[in-house]
Each structure stands twice: as structure tokens, then as C-alpha cells.
Amino acid sequence: MSSAKRSTSRVSKKKAAPAKDGAPKKREQSTRYKYVELNKASLTSAEAQHFYGVVIDATFPYKTNQERYICSLKVVDPSLYLKSQKGTGDASDYATLVLYAKRFEDLPIIHRIGDIIRVHRATLRLYNGQRQFNANVFYNSSWALFSTDKKSALQEIGGQEPASDLTPFAFSGKNYTFEKSEAALLQNIRKWAVQYFQQYNVISSDMFTPLNKAQAQKGDFDVVAKILQVFELDEYTNELKLKDQSGQVFYTLALKLKFPHLRAGEVVRIRSATYDETSTQKKVLLLSHYSNIVTFVSASKLAKEVKAKVTDDKSVEKAALKQDVSLSAVVLTEVDKKHAGLPTHSLQDLFHNADTDKEISSKDTFRTQFYITRVEPVDVKEWVKSYDRKTKKPSSHKGAGAKGGENIFQVQFLVKDASTQLNNNTYRVLLYTQDGLGANFFNVKPDNLYKNNDARKKLEEYNELLTKFNSYVDAVVERRNGFYFIKDTRIIF
């Protein structure tokens, strides 16, 4: 099974949307709910409250004791979103929503802020001057999540199409209700959410800590940063390279099963991180069991600003490559932007599961990460061949042969990754450029390396770099006749 499928399996099994037409299952007797605005819900009434809200922050569901799981969210709507509405400045205002359940799977997992939650039968109280809604899912409360963008975060990475814009992508219980009268309410709050994220930062400056001040923090703090790199540390864990507008670079570990939606280039909000005092080689953020990493809806003004202003100068990697032994993983390559959204597949997926996994067998282009144990031919001068397009045969430049042909690279990489770490196999990934695939991988034009000493020396340097400890390749590969060929990938060092 592919990593993309593994990551979404829990959500799809436990909270799968209904039949393809998106029609909810009908209860025997329809219940018409009266929805209230967050700031207009009565603090004195003992009656249960029903509401729609836009999520702007959330913990990951976590266990508090033997019988209780909890998830805490910040929600807004047109009645409650700016403190200036109370005459106290332009920072974001919100209500909190605390959901309780006896099972982890009965609570919502928020992957993206800006999406919409509908809650039935919550109670309301004032806690530290803030409106706090409490929903006991183990009693009679319920929730449903609706995407503000066309697709939910998991639908984006999984390639699924939503049933309809009135269908929740996740919900509590076995089914949900949806009255016709709710359609306009949902569409209106969705439209408002888009405008709200376009006009305001939403995550105002008082709601996160710049990374250059992280070391001074005594406890948990929140972060808004751009993911510069997603590195597969092992079969279960990704290491994220993060940078924010303060210019600081940090790293953090993110479990694949917990955070399957994260991609390089995206802007994220990290809820509840701490500074790692023990790390001396690089700056690290530690996450707790309740920490969350969420992306932003596409309309987000703040995300667009951070994405545009934060760039990767690769200074950390350049310094690491100068060391005899690099203690930090260095990804030597980048893939073409058109493949930025491709999920990463392991070598186990590509070489062992391709025939049995329907998702993999139906495609021919994949993204993968690996390290190189050996490059063949061992003699760098033989990396370039003369290719005769009439006979479709390559020949060596050695000696007096190879006249009139086209110079191409023919290189084989013997590779491994985290998923194949414990087996005795190595796997061949090919750089054969006669059809144009991978032509720019080396940033060196193929030439007769028996004569062109400058090109040969450059490629010898690349050979050393590619096989150096802790050096990795992030590549797009195309499957042809059972072989994987590198394409749309280039070395950036």
C-alpha cells in the first residue's frame, strides 16, 4: 500500500463521507436545528447551542485520562472575529470550542485552518473572559467538517473529488443530517471565510512567536513558517525544515500518519512547540502529543505573504557539505514545480508494491527520495555515451569509436531508502537521457569525457557528492517497461 493510502486510511474508514451522490442518510424524523452566531449565543440559557464556525486554530486530539479524549479549537464567524468589535484593537478575536469523547476517532482532526465546523448540542460558558463552547460527543453532541476550498486537505493529496460542496468531508458518528435550510447558511459562511482570510492575517501577531525569539520562550509557543523541505527520516517520520519571516531555520519531526498533508513550499501554523535545549548541531522544535501542524486555506493573505517572502538560500546545507561527515541530511536536488504536489512514494512502494497497489499501477510518474550507494559505470568517463538514433545503440567514446552520434548520459544509481533499509537489496534508478528525460540533472552538457577534462572533473565532484553520507536525492521518476527513469530533476549544489 502506498504512503498516501496509509496516511488517509484512518480518516476514510472511521469518518468516510456517504454515498457518491453525497446525500446524507435520513433520520426517521427530521430535526430542524436553530443555528446561532457565536457572539449572540446566550450565556444564561441552559439550552443546547447549534452553530457553524470557521476554524482558525486546533490542537490534535489527545488523551487526558483513561476514559477521556479532548480536542480544543478556536472558531470565528461574522459576529466574532476582531477584538476591535469590542473596541480593543485589531488582533483576532474568537470563541473556543472544546470537544470531549471516549474514543480518539470520535474527535475531529484539523489539517487546515479556514475550514468550517458545524456543531450540534454544545453548551456555552464564559472562561477567562472568552466564550467557550463545550461539546460532549460521548453524550449527544455531534460535529461535521466542511471544506472552504473545493477540496479538503486530504482530498488534495489523495486526488479524490468531493461528493458536493454541501457534503462534509468528515463527521462524528455513523451518519449526519443536513437540512435544505442549511445550504444557504453554509454557502454564506464559506464565502465570508474566503473574504476574511483574504482581508486579514487571521493568525495575528499575538498568536505566534517569531523563530528568532523561540529560544527565549519558557513553555509552549506557536509558529507560522514555510516548509522548505520534507525529508523522510524513516518509514514513519518526516523531518521538516522550517523558516519564518525572522529568517531563522528550524527543524522538527512530524509523524507521517499524524500529518500526511504536509508538502514542501507550504506555509503552516504549528500549535504548541517547545525549543529543544539539547540540540547542538541544529535548531529544533519539539512537538507534544497534542501539538498540531495545519496548513492554510488557499485564500490566506498571511500564507501568501510568508510563501513569497521566505526563500531558501541553502546556507545550512552548504555548510554541512563542507564537513567531512555531515550530521544533517542534505537533499541535493529539486524537482520541477509542476510536480510539487506529487506525494512521495517509497522504494518499497515502487519496486515491491507496484503490481498489487492499484494507485501505483495506474500511474507512471512518481516522486521518491533515496540515497545512492554506488554509481555505475564506476569510471566517470563512461557516463556519457554516443547514441546512434538510427540503430538506437549507445557506444563508448573510448578510443577511436563513437563517430557522429549524439552525446547522452547513461548512468545507473544503486539506491536505498528508509523503507528498504533493513533488506539486502539495492535498487536501480536510471539516468538515460536519449529521450530527454533527466537531461538537466547534472547541469552539465553531455560531452566526450575522455577529452573534456572540465566536464569530467565536475561530474567526478557530483559523484562524490551523491555518494556522500547523509546526501539524498529527491527525484521525479517515470516508469517505462518496469524500469524507473529520472526526469524533471536537477542537482542544486
From Swiss-Prot:
The keyword Protease does not apply. One of its GO terms (biological process) is telomere capping. The gene is STY56V. The sequence of STY56V is shown. STY56I differs in only one position. SUPFAM superfamilies: Nucleic acid-binding proteins. It is found in: Nucleus; Chromosome, Telomere. GO terms for molecular function: G-rich strand telomeric DNA binding; telomerase inhibitor activity. Heterodimer of an alpha and a beta subunit. Belongs to the telombin family. Keywords: Chromosome, DNA-binding, Nucleus, Telomere. Residues 7-17 have a biased composition (Basic residues). This is Telomere-binding protein subunit alpha. Coiled coil: none annotated. Its main location: nucleus. PANTHER family: PROTECTION OF TELOMERES 1, PROTECTION OF TELOMERES PROTEIN 1.
